[in-house]
Amino acid sequence: MHAALVPTWSSPCPIYTEIPDPGPPPPEQLQLKVLAVGIPRVVRLRARGIHPTAKSASLPYDPSIDGVGIDEQTGIMYYILPLSASCLAEKVNVDRDNLVPLQPGAPKPQPRNGPENGYGIALGDAADHRAETLDPIAIAGLVNPVSSSWMALRTRVDGEITGKTVLVLGATSKSGRAAVLVARFLGANKVIGVARREEGLRSVEGLDGWVTSGDMLPGETGVRFALPDWVGPVHIVLDYVGGSVAAGVLGSAEIEEGRELQYVQVGNLALELGTGEKHMFETLPGHLISRKPICIRGSGMGSFSRRDLVREMPGLVAFLARMKAPFGIASAPMCEVASVWQDEDTKGSRVVIVP
């Protein structure tokens, strides 16, 4: 069968190649035909060997993190949980515990703000989607960016989201755009976006307001980002950027009396982009967390469990099936993986590989 593998760490992308079939699965596994594999930023970092999850990988290497597949015997479609299989292949054997069925019979998710949210998405029958009504390409393209904020808000934040003000730092990124919609769906009263460019912020659906972080360059002295007074009290910060802007947000955010500011670092674009930015903790004044009621957490596999992810998947998939994608999704056959990986025309979209 065919697969897409990274041959060397100096290679810019995976190459289309042939590998042996996986063979019959043991009883604890299912063999799936892979339908779609998303290529988010983390997969590109893994392909270059610079993501922590790729540090001990051996070559040739499949950098995928998750995917959508179908059991050809039953017709049931499954989401393959992160880091549980090499998905850039035509077929894959996966432990049953690492599969979430995209079919009727899953527990119905309960929205935090009633049976229907402000965007008209009703969840009363959310899990009653038959596999054939779900678009595997859309699920594969959306699940990573949407799950980042969904899991952060559902498992890494104390208390309800309903009525809170959520600030999304990095709101113009794909995950940031999704985070705005997720926060809205889960009941946030106000969502504020922060990013470098006003033009990009104007195109983010669901914001109540935005703040531009400007062109703060590493090494500048006497320059510090601060939130304007009109933002008002902030309850939750979802940070996809990190760096000095994140430190500025924590230092300047107004905190409602008797409440705590909950900061969750989901990504760290400032470091990943190689701009020379320091980590937020290097720029955060040491006295700040003793003088302001701030709770600092991270979000990702490890900070929440695989069991948490399995529990949240029915609600997450129901939301994915109904949401309007906040960015373009560009699919390509796996035989074109090398060209689409480096194609400038796909940079504004989420690439999904179809084996």
Curated annotation (Swiss-Prot):
<dbReference type="GO" id="GO:0016491">
    <property type="term" value="F:oxidoreductase activity"/>
</dbReference>
<keyword id="KW-0521">NADP</keyword>
<keyword id="KW-0560">Oxidoreductase</keyword>
<comment type="similarity">
    <text>Belongs to the zinc-containing alcohol dehydrogenase family.</text>
</comment>
<protein>
    <recommendedName>
        <fullName>Probable NADPH-dependent quinone reductase tdiC</fullName>
        <ecNumber>1.1.1.-</ecNumber>
    </recommendedName>
</protein>
<comment type="pathway">
    <text>Secondary metabolite biosynthesis.</text>
</comment>
<dbReference type="InterPro" id="IPR051397">
    <property type="entry name" value="Zn-ADH-like_protein"/>
</dbReference>
<comment type="function">
    <text>Probable NADPH-dependent quinone reductase; part of the gene cluster that mediates the biosynthesis of terrequinone A, an antitumor agent. The first step in the biosynthetic pathway for terrequinone A is formation of indole pyruvic acid (IPA) from L-tryptophan by the aminotransferase tdiD. The nonribosomal peptide synthase tdiA then immediately converts unstable IPA to didemethylasterriquinone D (DDAQ D), via condensation of 2 IPA molecules. The symmetric connectivity of the 2 IPA molecules is thought to arise by head-to-tail dual Claisen condensations facilitated by the TE domain.</text>
</comment>
<dbReference type="GO" id="GO:1900796">
    <property type="term" value="P:terrequinone A biosynthetic process"/>
</dbReference>
<dbReference type="InterPro" id="IPR011032">
    <property type="entry name" value="GroES-like_sf"/>
</dbReference>
<dbReference type="InterPro" id="IPR036291">
    <property type="entry name" value="NAD(P)-bd_dom_sf"/>
</dbReference>
<dbReference type="GO" id="GO:0044550">
    <property type="term" value="P:secondary metabolite biosynthetic process"/>
</dbReference>
